[in-house]
Amino acid sequence: NGEYMVARNGWVGDYSDPSNMLDLFCTGNGNNDGKFSNADFDAAMEKAASTMDTAERSAALHQAEDVLMEQVGCIPVAYYNDFWLQSEKITGIWHSAYGFWYFMYGDIAE
């Protein structure tokens, strides 16, 4: 029912854009589990979504992020990273933006 003081949540970015994380905090977003709602934030996100100008879009996303941080809509504490070593002899293996490894395409060069 949303009646709690703090919760831990996680999200893995599936595409490389700030809106991937910021959209989660828009009023009414189905993944807005904390029920954050702020008119200034929503307006900045709407502006970012409605412009084709890259600089204007970037400024609107920065504004939305500023509002989110000022209102403590979330407290980022961690970012997932993967680290690995791979021999130059191994080819064809790739890692998707979703975090999946595709070993089935791998080969070992002699």
Locations of the language-model features?
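Short, solvent-exposed loop/beta-turn-alpha elements that line the ligand-binding surface or hinge
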Residues: 1-2, 20-50, 79-110
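Bilobed periplasmic-binding protein-like "clamshell/Venus-flytrap" ligand-binding domains
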Residues: 7-10, 52-88
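Short charge-dense sequence patches
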Residues: 9-19
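Solvent-exposed, acidic/flexible segments
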Residues: 15, 34-42, 54-61
